[in-house]
């Protein structure tokens, strides 16, 4: 090793990524993402190590491993939190993503997924701290690619997506319960909910779940699943509305909480609209963040 070579720490982050990109994993398998996210957040260098390892997978690995690297990258963006978002991006990763999207040496599934991810970042992450450069990559795509890729309708396989929906409904219910219970325990006249870090964590969880629910409500036609998704969405909306009501009751909310909330949860895309409790389906659903970014109607097959 040369005297000017960078010393690269190898931790559990690299070990997890190696395991999650192995050839015996399914393309869309998201098991292990929670553990990887925790490992990334354990150290200051975790996000950069993850970025570097994924970039090398995209450059040197097989098509399957490249797809897996893209899956993991998007899952980390959506689940690893602000520490990852604000520290993972660099010029080398940006250039590699463009290569994945435009270079014919990459397989069609890799190119298609990379294009969808770049478009997603532009649509949903332009105002997210740490994602400024990644969200601007769309301007560097060839015009044909930057304007294409919405014509194909995703194929919905309920057998495959069923477990994902179950997890989403359960996690949404838990998020709504956590936020609602935490709001009951405070006095809005003396404590601003938007200044309570734990409440803000629950609020962020609800916002993420809400956008995922909207995406599935728009896509799912099965009446049983749709009813369960709408019920979960109602719980989330009730909790979020309660948070806003508590904030409005606080005497200094109008002057203080806005700046705190925006800085603490800046990564949220508040463009997502609430779906009415009386909605019969996905007609009012807006574009939203999908917890399972790589399922047939996830972010790489964006629903308009």
Swiss-Prot record:
Q: Which GO terms describe its biological process?
A: actin cortical patch localization; actin cytoskeleton organization; actin filament organization; endocytosis; intracellular protein transport; vacuolar transport
Q: Which SUPFAM superfamilies match?
A: ENTH/VHS domain, GAT-like domain
- UniProt keyword annotation of Cytoplasm present: yes
**Gene3D superfamilies the UniProt entry points to:** 1.20.58.160, 1.25.40.90
* Gene Ontology CC terms, in alphabetical order: actin cortical patch; cell cortex; mitotic spindle pole body
This protein's major location comes to cytoplasm
Q: Which Pfam families match?
A: VHS
Output compositional bias ranges, type Low complexity: 274-286
Q: Which UniProt keywords apply?
A: Cytoplasm, Cytoskeleton, Endocytosis
Task: Output the Gene Ontology terms for molecular function.
Answer: phosphatidylinositol binding; ubiquitin binding
Region Disordered, residue ranges: 274-304
State the InterPro entries in the record. ENTH_VHS (IPR008942), GAT_LSB5 (IPR044103), GAT_sf (IPR038425), LSB5 (IPR045007), VHS_dom (IPR002014)
The protein's location, in the record's own words, is: Cytoplasm, Cell cortex; Cytoplasm, Cytoskeleton
Q: Which domain of life is it from?
A: Eukaryota
Record-annotated VHS domain positions: 20-149
Protein task: Essential for the organization of the actin cytoskeleton, fluid phase endocytosis and vesicle trafficking.
Q: Which family does the UniProt entry place this protein in?
A: Belongs to the LSB5 family.
Know the name of this protein?
Protein lsb5
Organism of this sequence:
Schizosaccharomyces pombe (strain 972 / ATCC 24843)
Give the source lineage, highest ranks first: Eukaryota, Fungi, Dikarya, Ascomycota, Taphrinomycotina
